């Protein structure tokens, strides 16, 4: 099993926000996690929220193996085996029916992937979420053109030096993308380490 120290640090703060969007009275909340990474997040969320039925996904083979290992280690009956998913491809290739998901989770992908991935994520969410469903993202964001603190500015420069197509997105650009996909930015939640959860809801 792969271990990311950042995932260990942020899994509890993210969970405290996420649980507000998983109705405890609902028998089953079906969710897709895009870019699941090591599998630490989906395992943590599934153990804490037994009515959350998660489908993790990744493109990297080592990550896919790690996710499967976490599922086995914790004997998670509410997590499916991970799917190989390229979020930059059309939502029709993702293997879900339109309006079939109540929640899509995406943690720490948007700033470290090409714009086609973020655009694909929002287009997919617009088609696959049920009306009233939530796209839940986490990471660093600038707000109305302002990126703070300096550590996030430095991080953004570091990302762009590795790949000019990478970098921190502005919330207004994501809001415009959401609007074009039939969603709206409902809430921003500040979390530790200068990151935020953004909650987009499908109309």
Curated annotation (Swiss-Prot):
UniProt-listed Pfam families: DUF938
Gene3D superfamilies in the record: Vaccinia Virus protein VP39
InterPro entries: DUF938, SAM-dependent_MTases_sf
UniProt-listed CDD domains: AdoMet_MTases
Signal peptide: none
Record family assignment: Belongs to the UPF0585 family.
Protein name, as recorded: Methyltransferase-like 26
Species per Swiss-Prot/TrEMBL record: Xenopus laevis (African clawed frog)
Gene name tied to this protein: mettl26
């Amino acid at each position: 099993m792969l271990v990311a120290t950042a995932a260990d640090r942020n899994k509890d703060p993210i969970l405290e926000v996420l649980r507000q969007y998983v109705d405890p009275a609902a028998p089953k909340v079906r969710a897709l996690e895009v870019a699941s990474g090591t599998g630490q997040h989906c395992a943590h969320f599934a153990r804490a929220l037994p009515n959350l039925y998660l489908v993790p996904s990744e493109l990297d083979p080592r990550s896919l193996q790690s996710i499967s290992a976490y599922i086995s280690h914790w004997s998670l009956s509410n997590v499916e085996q991970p799917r190989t998913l390229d979020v930059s491809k059309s939502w029709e290739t993702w293997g879900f029916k339109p309006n079939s998901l109540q929640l899509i989770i995406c943690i720490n992908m948007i700033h470290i992937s090409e714009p086609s991935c973020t655009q694909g994520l929002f287009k997919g969410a617009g088609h696959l979420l049920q009306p009233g469903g939530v796209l839940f993202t986490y990471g660093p964001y600038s707000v109305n053109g302002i990126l703070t603190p300096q550590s996030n500015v430095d991080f953004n420069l570091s990302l762009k030096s590795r790949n000019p197509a990478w970098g921190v997105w502005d919330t207004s650009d994501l809001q415009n993308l959401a609007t074009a996909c039939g969603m709206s930015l409902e809430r921003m939640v500040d979390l530790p380490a200068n990151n935020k959860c953004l909650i987009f809801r499908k109309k």
